[in-house]
Curated annotation (Swiss-Prot):
Protein source organism: Limosilactobacillus reuteri (strain DSM 20016)
Protein name in the entry: Gamma-glutamyl phosphate reductase
GO BP: any one term: L-proline biosynthetic process
SUPFAM superfamilies: ALDH-like
Xref: PROSITE patterns: PROA
Location(s) in or outside the cell: Cytoplasm
Pathway(s) the chain acts in: Amino-acid biosynthesis; L-proline biosynthesis; L-glutamate 5-semialdehyde from L-glutamate: step 2/2
Pfam families, sorted: Aldedh (PF00171)
Keywords: Amino-acid biosynthesis, Cytoplasm, NADP, Oxidoreductase, Proline biosynthesis
Gene coding for it: proA
Length: 414
């Protein structure tokens, strides 16, 4: 095991022990100072980001969009920290309490997870969001970003650590692994003595690599092969507005819609309308045989398309015979992130919500709302697509666990 990595783990554990005892007022004051220091040092961050962007000129636009940092995005990061400071602190919160037949008082209390490892790709905002959420919830964080964002992440973490140091707070609450090799990532995934949970942030390949390699417990997040189903009873104007929003507003993010399913009864009427609306925004459509017959500019779909998260202005279209056919298709190909039905029939809408096996299931709303901020959680550390511990947008509450505190007055078990 890499000795530098072990040293990082030990420092993180030590910081986590201190953070677990830190009061809410101190944490909130620190977060506000972190936000101010990001703004104060924005030129340093942008200069570092320019180095990363210069090395990524051959990468697709969807990649550089996630990588790019400017004054507005730094302001957004800072505002995210301020929002977290305003949120309720779940640590030390008592979920419930009771007295047993033997007179023992039992309290179920929220406590931090400990040390959280984040493995992520080219999203510098993750560095700041993760630091804010882990710090407020009393956890230390070890960050390992992709090589494409190494200069930006290094600058961000340097500023965050210097801010903590100036406040006489544990600087090792946030640490960055600057070795971006796969070998060090694999060792991090197995640092069970020091890391309590791993959260991968990125595409499906990264997430699956972490899930299959790690011996540290993993919260699986966010690949988003998201679907919108237009029911036979849908308001077609609403359906058009929601579909365009879900696909076009920000196609590179995990809650953007990638697939459009349309009930056969309305396909001839609706598909030409939605195809025109999407194509006006530069969306390339790929469809099944029926879709291609209805709109000649739609390209034939392949089996691989149904399983693909495009993160781009591409959308696959399928015509289905029934609500159950739509549900079956979605449950087979979905990454269990976010799906939506557009319908005026509330019974069919509720049935869809119950039958779909995804973290977030909408009726008559865009999948783009799957977001910690939109849910009222503040910034999120990721969107969990698994069922154990946390599911959906993960805010402060999801970064804690429970502890039972039992108080007696001399009881012994008979």
């Amino acid at each position: 095991m890499n000795q530098d990595l072990i040293a990082i783990g030990k420092r993180a554990q030590n910081a986590a022990n201190k953070l677990a005892l830190m009061n809410t007022a101190t944490k909130n004051k620190a977060l506000l100072q972190l936000a101010d220091d990001l703004i104060k040092n924005k030129n340093q961050i942008i200069a570092a980001n320019q180095q990363d962007l210069a090395a990524a000129t051959q990468m697709p636009t969807k990649f550089t969009d996630r990588l790019m940092v400017n004054s507005q995005r730094i302001a957004d990061m800072a505002n995210g920290l301020r929002t977290i400071a305003d949120l309720n602190d779940p640590t030390s919160q008592i979920d419930k309490g009771w007295i047993t037949k033997d007179g023992l008082q039992i309290l179920q209390r929220r406590v931090p997870l400990g040390v959280i490892g984040i493995i992520f790709e080219a999203r510098p905002n993750v560095t700041v969001d993760a630091t804010g959420l882990t710090f407020k919830s009393g956890n230390a964080v070890i960050l390992r970003g992709g090589k494409e964002a190494i200069q930006t992440n290094t600058a961000l973490v340097k500023i965050l650590r210097e801010s903590l140091q100036s406040q006489h707070l544990p600087v090792d609450a946030v640490q960055l692994i600057t070795d971006t090799s796969h070998a060090i990532a694999d060792e991090m995934m197995n640092l069970t003595d020091y890391i309590d949970v791993l959260i991968p942030r990125g595409g499906r390949a990264l997430i699956q690599r972490v899930v299959t390699t790690a011996t540290v417990p993993v919260i699986e997040t966010g690949a988003g092969n998201c679907h919108i189903y237009i029911d036979k009873d849908a308001d077609l104007t609403m359906a058009t507005n929601i579909t365009v929003n879900a696909k076009v507003q920000r196609p590179s993010v995990c809650n953007a819609a990638e697939k459009l399913l349309i009930h056969r009864d309305i396909a001839a009427k609706f598909l030409p309308v939605i195809a025109k609306a999407l194509m006006e925004h530069g969306v390339q459509l790929r469809g099944d045989e029926t879709a291609c017959q209805l709109v000649s500019t739609i390209r034939p779909v392949t089996e691989e398309d149904w399983d693909t998260e495009y993160n781009d202005l591409i959308m696959a279209v399928k015509i289905v015979d029934s609500l159950d056919d739509a549900i079956s298709h979605i449950n087979h190909y979905s990454t269990h992130h976010s799906e939506s039905i557009i319908t005026n029939n509330i019974t069919r809408g509720r049935y869809f919500q119950q039958a779909i096996n995804s973290a977030c299931v909408y009726v008559n709303a865009s999948t783009r709302f799957t977001d910690g901020g939109e849910f009222g959680f503040g910034a999120e550390i990721g969107i969990s697509t698994q069922k154990l511990h946390a599911r959906g947008p993960m805010g402060l509450q999801q970064l804690t666990t429970i502890k039972y505190e039992i108080t007696g007055n001399g009881q012994i078990r008979k």
